[in-house]
Amino acid sequence: TGIYYPEIDAFLKSATGVTSVHIFDHTIRVQDEGKRTGKQVRLPVATIHNDYTEWSGPKRVRDVMSEAEAERYLSHRFAMVNVWRSIGVSAERLPVVMADARTIRPDDFVASDLVYQDRKGEIFQVRHSMGQEWFYFPDMQPDEVVLLKCFDNATDCPARYTAHGTFENP
């Protein structure tokens, strides 16, 4: 994290034009169980979802920041963005898949509790409906990055959430 976080901070500022970035965690996902054993890595998520809801986005900010810092972020427009990339090898077998946000209706998002040992969260599961358009990034290389906006407190923006997951690419 000593090198990676500053690189991601600079990348997000350059790619989005934001002036402030707060990186609060990261997740490494590995399909191979042997590589997961005894390490802090998880399976790729195959269900289609979005990481935060109207309730859990601001709650997560309060969970990971001091009260003063959280209020500073929450008093202005803010977004939570995942940086998805392959590490070391191409991500062909389980690539990230996402929906065109213009094709997801608000009622396609279904709130679902996530209960951890130390906290309760909430995500959106995404139900299928006709008209949804999906795409993926084949053979993603370690030098390629996808940004997934998982929460935006601006209610008038074209995409507040990104329905996403992974799938088994035969």
PLM region spans:
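Non-heme Fe(II) oxygenase catalytic core, chiefly the N-lobe of the double-stranded beta-helix
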Residues: T1-P138
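Catalytic core of Fe(II)/2-oxoglutarate
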Residues: F124-P170
